[in-house]
Amino acid sequence: MADVKKVVLAYSGGLDTSVILKWLQDTYNCEVVTFTADLGQGEEVEPARAKAQAMGVKEIYIDDLREEFVRDFVFPMFRANTVYEGEYLLGTSIARPLIAKRLIEIANETGADAISHGATGKGNDQVRFELGAYALKPGVKVIAPWREWDLLSREKLMDYAEKHGIPIERHGKKKSPYSMDANLLHISYEGGVLEDTWTEHEEDMWRWSVSPENAPDQATYIELTYRNGDIVAIDGVEKSPATVLADLNRIGGANGIGRLDIVENRYVGMKSRGCYETPGGTIMLKAHRAIESITLDREVAHLKDELMPKYASLIYTGYWWSPERLMLQQMIDASQVNVNGVVRLKLYKGNVTVVGRKSDDSLFDANIATFEEDGGAYNQADAAGFIKLNALRMRIAANKGRSLL
């Protein structure tokens, strides 16, 4: 094997990464540093410390990255109203560049010459982790066990763990049949019955939300305060970025908001079905578009809408740390200087409805837009010349005999 002296492993403490830890020690005969990130996945991360210690790991990093995740990754993404393929709010994709960044930082701190991750050779995450790592540390070695070993089934992983004395839990019938990934922005479900695109997902699959049918019969109203494109307060109470998202997840989930069942196009070429719960993100997207509707110039808003699919694709395919994403981010952030104000929302049985928006930076002028007399604020006769000039090219073409019928 390649000459690797020390490797930083993205470690959850679960079966896969525990097997990877032992496999790295045996296969590469190297020292392993473990890194466990708390991104708000809702599971205790401290048990990973004891598991790593039991396997002889001396350098263990367990980092609470929730605030950084929302402040520096989720919020910047939502400033662009980012959606991949019309529906997916990129909950998994946006977490990977932060993990890659921290892996490289720890590698630099510990003198490690390699990093390792547990992403499979079929998915997008391998690309996201590694593109980020190479962008931040060009000479780093990346070890992806799923592309090297022959442990290609869960049963083989279990056998390997038992053979090498790795503590594992044999789950009974209550074990979820789905592959799940969670952070503060969302929780995803793949595999199991979802691999049949005609089979409806099971109701007990969902972890964060009630079904819209069982949501309260009374609507919930909330007000979100924006400053420079980011939410800074809920119902007038200022909160940190991570607290904002956590609270919106709780409120949205209680009202059956944020469920999604889609088939997406993976970067590696295949189609994949996934179900997602993104209650807070669903609310944030609706509210952000609402505050922009009164604060953004028309052409700026339209240009943002044109750029968004490219920006979304860059995040989905792992190019967060690319120069083109950084360039787009500067443009997006510049557009948010005047995106300030308050949005009022009605949450009811899976629906998010904007019922009010206001801002000191609003470009909406009721005196001009009114259907009543406007006191001369807008001269309707001016529209005739405007229409004639915009019709000029079409009239010329028609006069040349270029029929459209």
UniProtKB/Swiss-Prot annotation:
Pathway recorded for this protein: Amino-acid biosynthesis; L-arginine biosynthesis; L-arginine from L-ornithine and carbamoyl phosphate: step 2/3
Chain positions recorded as ATP binding sites: A10, Y11, S12, G13, G14, L15, D16, T17, S18, A37, G118
Binding site for L-citrulline: Y88, S93, N124, R128, S179, S188, E264, Y276
Keywords from the named record: Amino-acid biosynthesis, Arginine biosynthesis, ATP-binding, Cytoplasm, Ligase, Nucleotide-binding
Subcellular location(s) per record: Cytoplasm
GO biological-process terms attached to the record: argininosuccinate metabolic process; L-arginine biosynthetic process; urea cycle
Pfam families listed in its UniProt record: Arginosuc_syn_C, Arginosuc_synth
InterPro entries: Arginosuc_syn_C, Arginosuc_syn_N, Arginosuc_synth, Arginosuc_synth_CS, Arginosuc_synth_type_1_subfam, AS_cat/multimer_dom_body, Rossmann-like_a/b/a_fold
Family per similarity comment: Belongs to the argininosuccinate synthase family. Type 1 subfamily.
Protein name per UniProt: Argininosuccinate synthase
Organism for this UniProt entry: Pseudomonas putida (strain ATCC 47054 / DSM 6125 / CFBP 8728 / NCIMB 11950 / KT2440)
Gene: argG
